[in-house]
A protein has these predicted regions:
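Charged (often Lys/Glu-rich) extended helix/loop segments that serve as interaction or gating elements
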Residues: 1-140
Length: 140
């Protein structure tokens, strides 16, 4: 990539669980489908409101929504004492440089929409929304 900090990937918490002593946020995005660079190389994106754990802070792993067993990345801690709940947003920084060019629709997982934020008007403009037809056309 020749540009950094070019865009964010906004995800939503679908479920909060603890498995084998690990706190996991199940998200509506997939590392395997939307952020493959996080699995293929040692790239750990920054998350707004979170940081690398220090000492005995509560650690959170992020789980993706595909059926791939390894569709998770971790771990982070919240900047403030916070116990997340379904519906909360998790915003990954600096994700657009690979998110849009290396994505897959593995098992029909939808691509994230492309949206531009216009801060002077405090509004979002949807440039492209992906759906089933996009998946179907990729299958041939």
């Amino acid at each position: 990539a020749f540009l950094w900090d070019t865009g964010v990937l906004v995800s939503r918490v679908e479920d909060v669980l603890c498995n084998g002593g690990r706190n996991i946020l199940m998200l509506n995005v997939s590392f395997a489908c939307h952020m493959p660079d996080c699995l293929e190389m040692p790239y750990k994106p920054a998350i707004i409101g979170m940081h690398d754990p220090i000492g005995k802070e509560v650690r959170w792993y992020m789980g993706g929504n595909s059926c791939l067993a390894g569709d998770y990345v971790g771990c982070w801690s919240f900047d403030e004492r916070h116990w997340p709940k379904p519906g909360d947003l998790v915003v990954f920084r600096d994700m657009i440089h690979y998110t849009m060019v290396k994505t897959t629709m593995f098992n029909g997982v939808t691509h994230p929409s492309i949206v531009i934020y216009h801060p002077e008007e405090d509004r979002f403009e949807v440039i492209r929304r992906f759906g089933y037809e996009d998946y179907k056309h990729r299958m041939g």
